[in-house]
Amino acid sequence: MQNMVILGATGSIGASTLSVISANPFAYSVYGLVANASVDKMLALCVAHKPKVAHMVDEAAAKQLRAVLPATLNIQVTTGMNDLLGLVTAAEVDTVMAAIVGAAGLVPTLEAVKAGKRVLLANKEALVMSGELFIEATKRSGAVLLPVDSEHNAIFQCLPQEVQANLGRCDLAASGISHILLTGSGGPFLRSDLATLAAMTPAQACKHPNWSMGPKISVDSATMMNKGLEFIEARWLFNTQAEQLKVVIHPQSVIHSMVQYRDGSVIAQMGNPDMRTPIAHCMAYPQRIHSGVEPLDFFKVGQLSFYEPDFERFPCLALAMDACAQGQEATTVLNAANEIAVEAFLQGQIGFTQIAKVNEACLVTVPKCPMGSIEDILALDAQTRVYARETLASIA
């Protein structure tokens, strides 16, 4: 029986994880649930899954949860960073699902790694912001790191065992690998006239054609910043050089990514677009369990198509690839700027195409200095957010 903590329990990844746990009740136990401020959702999860600990990042939300949670459930409600770090490093915890969206997930995810936990990584920002530190911490602690993002999980499944066992430190060329092909659907605006993009609304941006996701990642998919962040994450997970990574637009989201080998072979991972598949794979690896996902019906798939990315349509993707080439400081700046810009777009403060303008302004302007610690990373993140908000004020 694996005891699990779910960071981001009330989000879409959290819901999918709990669905897989419910399908395999004799193999997994919910030890802790972590959310920001959604009291009603957390209350329902506590009643359904009966964790030992329910942690609310928001202190007022924790107080509200304590007031409404039935005492008979005997669930400890905690708040504050110290309690959160204590939860993810607790001796009773085997596995941590790292699914808090954005930079907020970095510190608890890194602490789980340092504690040697089995970490299921759905928070791509952890590697985008702290790739080298994160990989080094994994190496020192012996933590097991497994990628949950559908694309990185697909790549992982297509790799030989010696690469799977050495994430972040592997040698792709030595294993006969020539390229990693990172697929992306192109989002809801793949076929939209370029002249119409500036007027696109948050509701339109969040209407992904294939995947059901939260608002932030949905907007990132519409700008293809999500693919850019995944490009950076893949660089650290698979120890790649830029020339070993290619982005491929694949609108049907049936092939989740591919690995191309020196001999001309290409291995692809396919399946219906449902996050329960990569989640179940990571939870059970190297075994396989029931995920609740319907198997792919090849007779209904129809045509599969592939295109090169259009960087005029997706400037955020180009910015992310450029930042990856510049290094860790640039990717940290880009991530922070994008979080502020997307939040502003969702609140109606800026237009869709202005997201890229905010990101580019921060990349060009925010001074970058060497980062040797988590404190350095968080300081640069905070500095960038200040500048991004100033940039918003000038264009809003």
Swiss-Prot record:
Gene Ontology molecular function, alphabetical: 1-deoxy-D-xylulose-5-phosphate reductoisomerase activity; manganese ion binding; NADPH binding
Positions of 1-deoxy-D-xylulose 5-phosphate binding: K124, S150, E151, S185, H208, S221, N226, K227, E230
One of the GO BP terms on file: isopentenyl diphosphate biosynthetic process, methylerythritol 4-phosphate pathway involved in terpenoid biosynthetic process
Entry EC no(s): 1.1.1.267
Pathway: Isoprenoid biosynthesis; isopentenyl diphosphate biosynthesis via DXP pathway; isopentenyl diphosphate from 1-deoxy-D-xylulose 5-phosphate: step 1/6
Classification via InterPro entries: DXP_reductoisomerase, DXP_reductoisomerase_C, DXP_reductoisomerase_N, DXPR_C, DXPR_C_sf, NAD(P)-bd_dom_sf
Residue numbers binding Mn(2+): D149, E151, E230
Cofactors named for this entry: Mg(2+); Mn(2+)
Keywords: Isoprene biosynthesis, Manganese, Metal-binding, NADP, Oxidoreductase
Binding positions (NADPH): T10, G11, S12, I13, N123, E125, G214
Assigned protein family: Belongs to the DXR family.
Its job: Catalyzes the NADPH-dependent rearrangement and reduction of 1-deoxy-D-xylulose-5-phosphate (DXP) to 2-C-methyl-D-erythritol 4-phosphate (MEP).
Protein name (database record): 1-deoxy-D-xylulose 5-phosphate reductoisomerase
Organism: Shewanella baltica (strain OS155 / ATCC BAA-1091)
Gene: dxr
